[in-house]
Amino acid sequence: LYILLGFILIASAVDLYSHYNIPSLYNIYKNRGTRLLFALLITIGLLIAVITMPPKFLIGKHILWISWVAVLGYVLYPLAQLNRRIFEQTKILVLSYMALLTMITFKWPHKISLTWGRTLLMLLMVLILVRIVGFFRPYTSQTHFMISYAAVVLFSFFMLYDTKLLIVKAKKCVKADYINDSLGVFLDGMNLFVNMFHLRR
């Protein structure tokens, strides 16, 4: 529920920013400077606040979560400005793809191992390092395409892994923190969206 609600809120936030012509961070994709760093710091800071706040503080945790989603929408807003048609098409594509991966996980859960976690984390660190290098020494468009393609593959496996993790937690009936439990799949979807958008441009 929170995964779907998060996507709806982000899409609504982007539409709201566009409707009221809110100044965006469009130039962060061209002039990579303090604005990008500032946006990333706010996003990470809010995410940490959401994760660390106990679920018993229901209202406060939801306010932080909604604020984080709104900031994510603002960070994604420049993509809608770059090409609104591709942005809308990618939304449908990613939601369909995530639904497919979810069905695969439920159909063949034994094919997905929770031992993947360490390997996936190591590959994610490599991807982040590659992105950081590109921040200071821009890659060619072909290299960007290859990196985005690799990221889609990586986060597809993350999606399978995180969905399996949700299934296992649900079966164990552990104390639920629905927002935190949904963050893995939600972030997988966001990363799939960004990288698929760049592949389609």
Language model region names:
Residues 1-201:
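A hydrophobic alpha-helical transmembrane-helix feature that marks the membrane cores
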